[in-house]
Amino acid sequence: MDMKLQEILEQAVRDEDVSDIFLVAGLPVTMKRNGVQARVEMPFLMPKDIGELVEQIYEEAKRKKTRLENGEDDDFSLSMSRRENFPGGRFRVNVFRQRGSLAAVIRVIRFELPDPGKLGIPEDILALTDDSQGRNNKNGGLVLVT
C-alpha cells in the first residue's frame, strides 16, 4: 500500500472534530472524533505500512530515530507548512512499539482557540475572565480548573 502521511494529516486537519490519529498494525487508520474513535474507510495497515508512515513522520519532522532505535518511545512535535492542497498544521507525535510492531498516535494541535461555548464551559466560569459584556471585571484573567 502506498499511503501518504500528508493525506492522513490533511483529512484530520480539515475535520475540526478530529483530535487524534491512531496508526496501529492490523487496523485501518483510526481518528478520534468528538471523543469517539472511528476507523477511516481504507485498507487495514500492515506492519510494513506503519513503518513507511513512521519513516515519513521522521523525515517531515527532520528528526533522527535514535530513541526509537534504542527501544524507547519517542515524543515530539511536527509542524507542516501550507502546501498545495494541504492547509498546514501542528501535531504532537508519540511513536512506540506495540505487539512487536511500530505504532503511532498523532494529536492535532489547532491554530485557533476553540469556542468556549462549544466546550460547554458554564457562563459563570466564563464571566470570571470576560469583560466583553460590560461586567467591569477588573480582575479578569486566567482561570485554572484542576
What residues fall within each predicted segment?
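N-terminal "pre-motor" subdomain/linker immediately upstream of P-loop NTPase catalytic cores
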Residues: 1-146
